[in-house]
Amino acid sequence: MNCPYCSHPDTKVIDSRDVDDGVRRRRECVVCGQRFTTYERFQPAGLFVVKKDQRREEFNKEKLLSGLRRACEKRPLPAGAVDKIAGDIEAELYNMGKAEIPSTLLGDMVMEKLKALDNIAYVRFASVYREFTDITQLKKVVDNLVSGQDEGIHKGQLSLLPEDRVSPKTRYQRR
């Protein structure tokens, strides 16, 4: 590891600790004596995002974070919530085991996470992601949020079980 202060290639590790997704190391340069911190993280195999125009772009967590931060700007959210969402989405994408994922899947994942976190951030992101061209489209999303309907479920879609057949008596009780 080269020293960031004098560029000498010889440094020694003073302290090493496990952090959330890697290892944090405190290092000291043997020439200038300056101390600095490095982080080691697992670098998964390349993951590519297939855009609407079929271009392929390497997945960039910083780009995801930037979009999330813009949507959540000036919102009273818990510290680290945006970073957690980005980390969760990244983990889900890599767990899929695919080399390429469509940008629509990534956008839908962000929408789902933001909807659970903050409605205003959700609407902000949706307005850019869904490319609203007029106020009626925005109003429809807001109305769906207020009424509790999910955009992905159509009114004509049948439920898994009819409402009259589901009763609290059918639950199993512990013995």
Swiss-Prot record:
| Zinc fingers (unnamed) by residue | 3-32
Cofactor binding description: Binds 1 zinc ion.
Q: Which GO terms describe its molecular function?
A: ATP binding; DNA binding; zinc ion binding
Pfam families referenced in this protein's UniProt entry, alphabetically:
ATP-cone, Zn_ribbon_NrdR
Q: Which domain of life is it from?
A: Bacteria
Q: Which family does it belong to?
A: Belongs to the NrdR family.
Q: What is this protein called?
A: Transcriptional repressor NrdR
Give the organism the record lists: Dehalococcoides mccartyi (strain ATCC BAA-2266 / KCTC 15142 / 195)
Q: What is the lineage of its organism?
A: Bacteria, Bacillati, Chloroflexota, Dehalococcoidia, Dehalococcoidales
Gene name per UniProt: nrdR
